Regions:
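C-terminal alpha-helix plus adjacent terminal tail
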Residues: 49-56, 72, 76, 80-134
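Crotonase-fold acyl-CoA enzyme core
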Residues: 2-89
């Protein structure tokens, strides 16, 4: 969701970041989530790895842009949205995407965070937790 430009979702959507519960953290996706919802909402997700957040929470915090009641409305809303977007100037859409994703530091931080995740993944305590999940 955090890597999407625009999200239309069902009211049934539930999300959580469970990484902390398995001995690592959401380091690989942290920058994308922070960019989308900010530090406070990211902290709420990351420090509560067993707690599901509702579609209302996602909407209030900017993770999704529109919530619909049922699958029929979801399909209708998606068709309407894509029907509009497809008629926009391609160059304008391309430049908009470029501007929205212009934060160059994200790539570097994601690489650094990948190293953190790798170190944590090989720790005995993390391995023990992961083996229990298997």
């Amino acid at each position: 969701l955090a890597a999407s430009d625009y999200v239309i979702a069902s009211h049934k959507v539930l999300i959580k970041l469970s990484e902390l519960a398995i001995g690592i953290g959401p380091f690989l996706i942290e920058q994308l989530i922070r960019r989308k919802i900010g530090v406070s909402a990211l902290s709420s997700l990351a420090y509560n790895p067993k707690k599901w957040k509702s579609s209302d929470w996602c909407l209030e915090n900017g993770l999704i842009n529109d919530v619909v009641d049922n699958e029929k409305k979801l399909n209708l809303t998606l068709n309407e949205f894509t029907g509009e977007v497809i008629n926009y100037q391609l160059e304008s859409l391309t430049m908009l995407k470029k501007v929205l994703w212009s934060d160059k530091k994200i790539d570097n931080v994601i690489l650094e965070n990948a190293e953190i995740s790798a170190r944590l993944l090989i720790m005995p305590k993390t391995q023990k937790i992961l083996n229990k999940i298997k």
